[in-house]
Each structure stands twice: as C-alpha cells, then as structure tokens.
Curated annotation (Swiss-Prot):
It comes from Marinobacter nauticus (strain ATCC 700491 / DSM 11845 / VT8) (Marinobacter aquaeolei). HAMAP family: DapE. Binds 2 Zn(2+) or Co(2+) ions per subunit. It catalyses: N-succinyl-(2S,6S)-2,6-diaminopimelate + H2O = (2S,6S)-2,6-diaminopimelate + succinate. Pathway: Amino-acid biosynthesis; L-lysine biosynthesis via DAP pathway; LL-2,6-diaminopimelate from (S)-tetrahydrodipicolinate (succinylase route): step 3/3. The keyword Hydrolase applies. SUPFAM superfamilies: Bacterial exopeptidase dimerisation domain, Zn-dependent exopeptidases. Its cofactor is Zn(2+); Co(2+). Pfam families: M20_dimer (PF07687), Peptidase_M20 (PF01546). Its EC number is 3.5.1.18. This is Succinyl-diaminopimelate desuccinylase. It is an enzyme of class 3 (hydrolase).
Amino acid sequence: MSLSPTLELAKDLIRRQSVTPDDAGCQELMMSRLAPLGFSGENLRFGETDNLWARKGNNGPVLAFAGHTDVVPTGPEKNWAHPPFDPIIKDGYLHGRGAADMKGSLAAFITACERFVANHPNHRGSIALLITSDEEGPAQDGTVKVVETLEARNEKMDWCLIGEPSSTHQVGDVIKNGRRGSLHGYLTVRGVQGHVAYPHLAENAVHNVAPALDALAKEFWDNGNDFFPPTTFQITRVEAGVGSNIVPGECLVHFNFRYCTENTAESLEERVVAILDRHNLKYDLQWHLSGRPFLTDKGALVSAAQNAIRTVTGRETELSTSGGTSDGRFIAPTGAQVVELGPINATIHKVDECVKAEDLDTLSEIYEQILVELLA
C-alpha cells in the first residue's frame, strides 16, 4: 500500500536516531525538500546543537514554523512492541520515537508547504522554519540562540506556529495560545550533623525544614485568571542523610513553580524567602527561571488556526495554556503571535509512542489551510 508524502517523510525522519542534541541528518533531509520550493537554508550550530533557519521570501509578513528534530531517549528497547527507530504503520497507527513529538508535525508542515507553494507560487510575505535539535534537553543552544541571532540582524517573525502535540482526543481539538512560566528553586538547609543517640548535640536539618516545606505546600499562590489555571508549587526532590545512625546536617530540596500571569518570578521568589525566614532557617537558595508565561490573545494567527481546523475537520477548537513549557517561551518575547498545534499527545515520551496515521495527513491539511488564511 502506498503511503502519503507526509507519512513517507515522517517515517524517514523517525529512522534517524536524533536523541538530544543529535540531529542525525534530519535537518538536511528537511532542507532537501524545502530547497526545490525556493527556500534558502542557514545552518546555525551552537555547541553540540544543530539549528536550521530556512526562509522563502524577503518581505513581510513572516509566518514561521518552529519545531525540533531531537527526541527523548527510548529507554530499554526490549520494552517496545516495535523497534523505536524502525517506524511501522500497524492497525492505522504510525509507531516510532518522535511520531507524535514531533517528527510527524515536521513532515506535515513540509508537505503542506509543498502543496501551498505549488498552488500559490506568488504568495505574499514569507514562510520560514526554525528547527532545532535541542528542545528536549537543556534548550540552551537551540531556539533561544537562533532567536538572538535573528533579533541581532532585525529579522522578525510576525506569526509563529509551533508543531508541539497539542491535541487531546482528536487532531485540532486543542491549540495552545500560551504557556505558564516555570521557575525552579534549589534549597540547601544547614543543621549540625551528629549521632542519632545524642540528638541534643546535633541539629536535624530535615526536622528544621519540614515545617517550612509544609507551609510552602499549603500556601495559596493565586486563583489563576481567564487564560491560565492557578499557580502550582511542587517539591520535586528531597535529599538528606549519609547513614542510618547519623543526624543529617544538611537537607537539599528542589521545587518547581508553574505560574500564571497573576504572579511574576520575582514575586514568587520574595514570597518563598519570606516563608523560609519565618522559620528561622539557615539556608542557601538558588533560582533558575526556565521561562516566563506568555499569551497570544485572539488575533490573526489564532483566527487562522481556528478557521483552518474548522474548514478541514468541521470542529471547533479549544484554546488552552495548560501543559509544560515549550520553545514558544523564547519566541513570544520578540512580539510574534505564537500558537502550538500538533497531533494527539497521549503517547509522547512513552514506550510505544505512536500517532494515528490519518491524523498526520489531516494535520498537513490544517497547516496548508493556515498558510492559505495568512499568505495566499
């Protein structure tokens, strides 16, 4: 049975074992399809990360597609029903690491471009792709560096469509028009190490920090708003002790905020410090801001995505800001409108990752219709 161009390309991409930060030739394959359409490609390598900025056209407005070729590790391959880098279509599903996150989306957008350019050779504006091999990892040498490069030469994106797997039950039923911020805290609480039989000669760091952690876990941070759910606080790691007969003199605690626009990173940091200080702790605290929250309100890009989904599938879509962070956090501050639209996310990062094969063809049609809405 012959496969659609989208599915053939998705399989070719999945065969390339591009575990972060290895691109494994994916971007070269993509560029081989884009160049005949009139795209010029620029390879931007930072550290061990390969990035591609491909563009067709010199004028605005610019519709960019952002995505990543890297995938998360597979874990023991013996746990997979099918080899993760030997894609197979079985019972209507395309199986393989990256099928949903996000090589299926990459293939869908490229084939959408092929059809759009064939039907609209004199389209207005420009089409661009920002592709990285460092999204699933530290994300330090990927999209953020490309954005910095583009800004330094005053090259702007008006709209950015990110191919992250946003859908829940049916392709296109959810699009992300924003994301919460992510703030990490790394807390070290100091006590005095000693023998468990002589606690009066020691100071248990775990006992000291426990009431403060309880207070942080019970703290009401905010109510959320019309666009974002309430801010959440989660303790992600607690480490202490070097032996069963030793009072721990130090306790390490890692925690994370997923926060909405009712708070800022700075306001959360201040409130955490105030709670810790109320408990008279001896501590060190370091912060890492992974990304600030962003929101794309209803406008040209959101409307184009909604109209495209309605035209292709006949269904209305839900706007959502739930889920984890994405590279949209690096693009939104440039002023570009940003939405995420991709396949169903039920199996992402899991053993036996898969996506319904026909969904990738549907997604390609939606992407093509977005191009029509904005640039035809």
